[in-house]
Amino acid sequence: PQEPSSPDYDSHAYLWGLGSVVSAFNAIVQNTDNVDFRMTYESRLKETLLKYYNTTKEPMCFGCFVNPHDQRLYDDAIWVGIDLADLYSKTKDSWYLDYAKSVWNFVLSGKDDELGGGVYWDENAKDSKNTCSNAPAVVLALKLYQITNDAAYLENGKDIYKWTKSKLQDPSDYLYWDCIKTSGKIETSKFSYNSGQMMQAAVLLYNATGEEQYLTDAKLLAEACYNYFFENFISNSSGEQFRILKDGSRWFNAIMVRGFLELNKVESNGTYMIAIRKSVDHAWKYTRDAETGLFFKQFSGNDITDNPGDILAQGAMVEFCLLYTSDAAD
């Protein structure tokens, strides 16, 4: 994962960061009955998203920046599309579904037979196919299938899932590599959100098809994620000892936790849920800046050296706090 390379890049205004705000808004709408909150912020959210909607390229979709000539990354758009699909399911506002479908059309434009299938990461470069542009594409496809009952979404989701598993899963530990280059070279870095999205995708496919292999995939991946992306921890602040989400990107970890929560709806596992709850509790109590109330990037709080305010971290913490208290976490 990397920040966009476009000369139009603005670290303070880009779709990836905005997407975490959309996820935070979605988490609040999904898990509370706060109508006033929705009425206060919904129109502003829509207006802001439309500033990123690129109508100069086909198929039309959200771009990385507020610029009609900007870079468009498939994964950045997909994260937004997933939240829009969720928001439609909750509110029945057709605006959300229309734009979620436009994201899907954009995804299909990035899918071809190079390397046997899969979705590219960058619309312009088309030099790699990444787990981060394929795993969430499956999640979006299955959410649209749930909404529309259109079998084309299911078939595309199954196809992309099969390709991603065959090309990007490490058979030694079930976790997912970062990407495969068009040259065939595999970038072997492992990030929590990639494996977490394949976990969620597997559960959604199991729900849609009833095929046990998908549930088996999800359970194996959950155990692998728990072993790799959590660690034993003693808090300098409280002295408590527990398994905690490893330091790194809070946003990556929030995306991974979506997979754990999806699986927990089907087959509960207290070990995973306790680790997530304790991680979030600790982060809430001990990793906030006293002056601003904003969160640092690190989860442990043992060695805070970064500045608070990273928008991805803030959006992730809103999602964490809402999702881990939801019915899915029971």
Regions flagged by a language model, labelled:
Residues 1-4, 39-61, 98-117, 156-175, ...:
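Long, well-ordered core segments of solenoidal/helical folds
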Residues 2-83, 89-97:
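N-terminal carbohydrate-binding/catalytic regions of secreted carbohydrate-active enzymes
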Residues 10-30, 72-89, 128-145, 189-207, ...:
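Well-ordered alpha-helical segments within folded domains of soluble proteins
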Residues 28-43, 86-102, 144-159, 203-219, ...:
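Structural helix-adjacent loops and short alpha-helical linkers that scaffold large soluble proteins
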Residues 75-78, 82-86, 91-123:
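Extracytoplasmic mature domains of secreted/periplasmic and thylakoid-lumen proteins
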Residues 140-189, 196, 201, 208-209, ...:
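Noncatalytic carbohydrate-binding groove/subsite architecture in carbohydrate-active enzymes
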Residues 171-174, 206-309:
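Non-catalytic carbohydrate-binding regions of carbohydrate-active enzymes
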Residues 324-330:
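Conserved small/polar residues in nucleotide/adenosyl-binding loops
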